[in-house]
């Protein structure tokens, strides 16, 4: 079924035109299989998701063995030659929802999700402090400043701060795959 994909359980489908898109459909799922791991168990006190969000196969292989890392570099740190400081490092596999569940929930009300659309996961956090995924969590709502090289502290981002996000797939028995990095710098309001 090269060049064509169907959404499970529904009437909608999309057709991919061109050899590049058709090749991508066949390539990405096979490459991604080595990254797929079991979804972590939900806390016993949490309710069972609705049937359209629950699939045993997705629970068995719906999470990804991807490590994410977030670093912070202030203008003062860059001027002094300091390396960015790591704020957080944690597993994407600890997400509460799988990618399939996010897509199902996004489209259940009729939203026409298309190939190439970006879908945000929200903050990725785990139980321990070093895996918290936001400055709000790390600074305990601004009450606990994060100490940086050169005596600076942060509870929230400031003008000139640069965030670096990195990710790589790591799983025993498989090669590590790096996804590169994404950088963003806070510019002063005009």
Where are these regions (language model features)?
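Catalytic-core "active-site belt" of small-molecule-metabolizing enzymes
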Residues: 3, 8-10, 18-114, 120, ...
């Amino acid at each position: 079924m090269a060049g064509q994909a169907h959404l499970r359980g529904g009437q909608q489908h999309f057709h991919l035109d061109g050899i590049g898109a058709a090749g991508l459909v066949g390539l990405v799922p096979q490459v991604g299989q080595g990254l797929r791991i079991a979804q972590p168990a939900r806390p016993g006190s949490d309710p069972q998701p609705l049937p359209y969000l629950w699939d045993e196969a997705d629970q068995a292989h719906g999470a990804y063995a991807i490590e994410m890392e977030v670093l912070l570099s202030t203008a003062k740190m860059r001027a002094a030659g300091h390396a960015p400081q790591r704020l957080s490092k944690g597993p994407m596999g600890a997400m509460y929802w799988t990618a399939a569940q996010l897509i199902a929930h996004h489209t259940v009300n009729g939203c026409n999700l298309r190939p190439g659309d970006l879908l945000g996961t929200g903050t990725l956090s785990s139980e321990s402090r070093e895996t918290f995924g936001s400055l709000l969590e790390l600074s305990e709502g601004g009450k606990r400043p994060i100490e940086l090289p050169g005596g600076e502290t942060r509870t929230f981002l400031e003008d000139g701060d640069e965030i670096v996000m990195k990710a790589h797939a790591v799983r025993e028995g498989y090669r590590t795959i790096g996804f590169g990095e994404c950088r963003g710098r806070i510019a002063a309001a005009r």
